[in-house]
Amino acid sequence: MAQLQEWLGKIEYELLAGDPAVAVDDVIYDSRKAAPGKVFVCIPGSRADGHDFIPDVYEKGVRAFVVEKKLSELRIPEDPSVTVLRVPDARKALAYLAAERFGNPFRKMISIGVTGTKGKTTVTTMIRTILEASGKKAGLIGTTGCFIDGKRTPTVNTTPESYELHEDFAKMVEAGCEYVIMECSSQGFKLQRTCGLMYDCGIFLNISPDHIGPAEHESFEEYLACKAMLLSQCRKAIVNDDALHTDEVIRISGIAPEKVIRYSVKHDADVSVGAIEYISTPDFTGTRFTAKGLYEGEILLPLPGYFNIENTLAALTASALLSLPAEKVAEGVLSTSVNGRMEVVARTDRFTIFVDYAHNEVSMVSLLDTLRKDYKPERLVVIFGCGGNRSKDRRTGMGKAAAEAADFTVITSDNPRFEKPEDILRDIHEAYLEAGGKEENCILIADRRAAIRYAMEHAEKGDMIAVIGKGHEDYVEINGVRTHFLDREVILEEKEALKL
């Protein structure tokens, strides 16, 4: 047991009742975990308010509370054993409490945070692979899970809640990790999940309009400001000099110019590119290029696409900052494999088929344009859908992108959630036609497995087939129920069934 006051650290608070020296053994924000010895942080959420659960957790033995509201607004029993602390921001308080409760494990590792609308998973995975090739032990937290000692545990969010973050950091330290690499989402910054963390290196990849809506960001300006928070929480910043809004992100963050390192594919920078060769053979799809500047050497990249050169430059710049040996860096890049990110799943004498997470207009256009320009397929086929109960702008944008950038389009389901799949497909199809797409170059197949099978069965020689939108996701959500579905598995199963 500890005294609550030992965990308060940087937290500004007003003591409303009781004694901050109360004995506690853990921090909770979920009322279902209530038990004697816990301090309950009352977080006001979009769906539920933690303050409303005070009577319930009190009945389960909780006697220490961190709140945002006045005592008169709370239903707290009159009990001299109860301690109540009022704070300006309960989410910030949770982050500081969690850090202290686990002994500030984040500070015991070299830390790298990566933010961007697209590319976070690829860059964090590549940096981890490079570190491991260099003989360093690294933990990773991101969209595809938390990775410690070769073991993966699922994460609910790209950037988990602050308590879970510090719990994972503690496990990493216990496992002997020297480094931690994190995907840092804008939502994570907005909800103070990374509050109090100072990264040794922060990487800004790019930003484009996305995640703007009632449950996410109110405006692009807010989204931009949240992305910029990483640069205000790092000792050194690595930025993509080719991305839109990079200078604005630097300005908003307030980071000193001498702490910023720039990389570019288009022009000379601290790290840049020389000759580029795009490779597509029966055995390898990827890129060979020469890097110059802070990192120098030839790189063979097994991930297709121009934007993956950008992603790789970010990882190379971080490697240079960490003084990792160049030959080990190149070895790490070559062995990088990212589930659901430009992942080549199968090749035949007729087609190459791969999976990608592209789930909005910007990432879809970038992917399709790159494939056409760099690999020059005879035909570019795209299979995609849009999630239900989400902004309909994505349906319009992705339908338009398919009409403009693909030769043949298969519109299918993604996660329909509580909408009818047929309604979503119709919205996408209408946008496709309005953008000039031809009816004969498009088919609607609501069953995603059947859609994948159709594209492979009807493939023509030289086809590149992109199955996009779900990437690493291993489920489909229909009417609130998730059932197992992984694009990669389905492709291989259907390929075998078709004897291709």
Model-derived segments and their meaning:
Residues M1-Y96, L300, P304-Y306, E493-L500:
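N-terminal leader/targeting and accessory segments in enzymes
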Residues V67-E68, P88, G142, C184, ...:
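Short loop/edge segments at beta-strand edges and connector loops
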Residues L8, K92-A237, D241, D247-A256, ...:
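Phosphate-binding loop of NTP-binding sites
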Residues E59, R63-K69, A237-D241, V381-F384, ...:
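Short internal beta-strands
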Residues M1-L15, P36-V39, D49, P257-K259, ...:
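ATP-dependent carboxylate-amine ligase
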Residues V24, P36-G37, V62, S81, ...:
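Short, well-ordered alpha-helix to beta-strand connector turns
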Residues K10, E73-E78, A175, K190, ...:
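Acidic, Mg2+-coordinating active-site environments of NTP-dependent enzymes
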Residues V67-K70, C184, N206, D241, ...:
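Short secondary-structure boundary segments
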